[in-house]
């Protein structure tokens, strides 16, 4: 199916980036934690447990009184939400006919009870759903959110809940003198890529280590003389001092070589790391001999293949520090 453009933004709620379903009022038939699993939902006919057919999703009991069912998700990457997907895959006679989505921004780590007492902002009003379908809803909001609440009307099952958006890091939680300028959780984002046949380039800058090959970025095999690449807008203008190119899990399909280029406008590029040989299944760390200010990074791999993670350690410039802090303040006020 053709997906909206905003679905290319990272999933801020995914378990892979630290998201958590902190509460649900009911999960009799299927657990709430399934909502944010990064894998696509599965269905195994004739797999029955003590409560009936086993579903890969969140499913509540049939309501016999007025009301709705709800689940609260703590975003692994707080940020600006551009859209949500309520995926009812494999729920046919038991999907909710309607859903709505709200959000809240709060410091610290409040309990479910404390969260429920807050004033929530509507991102998606009560809207009709289709069964066994991805139901996308674009969100128009410029605020930074930390928690999202999914309400289903009146009950039923949802396989996955995706919250796409742009991460906005809290500068109070970072040492702005030295950190990963290319980290998704700090506000970096992929702006372009030559190929994403096997997996998304967003994986390159995701938190933590890749646990399997599928959690990295892998391109199709090239049959021409070109090479693959990905471009990233960094968390802020900075001066990098160390690059990490991680090919963990990629053995017969790692790139043979890679290079890094930098830019202050995303158009004119200069060399950061010359074309350098890579080894399969290896974390490579390269000190950068002549660090320069940059706000964009381009990774070229030769000729194709896969990479688990890309890190770029350094400090923000004065302008980068100012823009980083202002972005957070602007997203706080919306």
Model region roles, listed by residue range:
Residues 79-90, 150, 239-249, 299:
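A short beta-strand element within beta-rich, extracytoplasmic domains
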Residues 152, 220, 249-252, 258-334:
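C-terminal functional regions that serve as terminal interaction/effector modules
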Residues 78, 120-157, 227, 238, ...:
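Beta-sandwich interaction modules
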Residues 94-107, 253-265:
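Short, surface-exposed beta-strand/strand-loop-strand elements in extracellular ectodomains
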Residues 1-70, 74, 166-235, 251-253, ...:
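Disordered, acidic Ser/Thr/Pro-rich linker "stalks" and the adjacent N-terminal cap
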Residues 87, 102-106, 164, 246, ...:
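Predominantly extracellular/luminal cell-surface or secreted proteins
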Residues 50-54, 110-137, 203-222, 269-288:
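Intrinsic, low-complexity N-terminal interaction/targeting segments
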């Amino acid at each position: 199916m053709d997906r909206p453009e905003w679905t290319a933004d990272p999933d801020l709620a995914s378990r892979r980036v630290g998201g958590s379903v902190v509460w649900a009022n009911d999960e009799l038939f299927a657990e709430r934690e399934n909502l944010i699993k990064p894998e696509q939902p599965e269905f195994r006919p004739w797999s029955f447990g003590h409560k009936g057919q086993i579903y890969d999703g969140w499913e509540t009991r049939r309501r016999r009184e007025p009301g709705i069912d709800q689940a609260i998700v703590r975003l692994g990457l707080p940020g600006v939400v551009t859209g949500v997907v309520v995926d009812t895959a494999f729920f046919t006679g038991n999907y909710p006919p309607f859903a709505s989505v709200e959000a809240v921004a709060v410091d610290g780590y409040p309990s479910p009870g404390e969260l429920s007492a807050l004033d929530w902002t509507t991102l998606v009003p009560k809207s009709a759903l289709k069964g066994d379908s991805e139901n996308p809803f674009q969100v128009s909001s410029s605020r930074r959110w930390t928690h999202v609440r999914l309400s289903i009307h009146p009950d039923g099952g949802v396989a996955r809940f995706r919250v796409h958006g742009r991460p906005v890091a809290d500068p109070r939680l970072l040492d702005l003198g030295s950190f990963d300028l290319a980290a998704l959780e700090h506000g970096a984002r992929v702006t372009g890529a030559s190929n994403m046949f096997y997996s998304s380039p967003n994986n390159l800058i995701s938190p933590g280590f890749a646990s399997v090959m599928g959690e990295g970025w892998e391109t199709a095999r090239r049959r021409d003389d070109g090479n693959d690449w990905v471009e990233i807008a960094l968390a802020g203008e900075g001066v990098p001092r160390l690059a990490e190119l991680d090919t963990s899990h990629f053995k017969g399909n790692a790139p043979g070589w890679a290079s890094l280029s930098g830019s202050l406008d995303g158009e004119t590029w200069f060399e950061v790391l010359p074309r350098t040989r890579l080894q399969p299944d290896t974390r490579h760390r390269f000190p950068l001999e002549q660090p320069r200010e940059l706000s964009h990074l381009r990774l070229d791999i030769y000729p194709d293949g896969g990479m688990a993670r890309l890190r770029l350690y350094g400090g923000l410039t004065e302008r980068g520090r100012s823009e980083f802090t202002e972005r957070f303040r602007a997203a706080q006020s919306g």
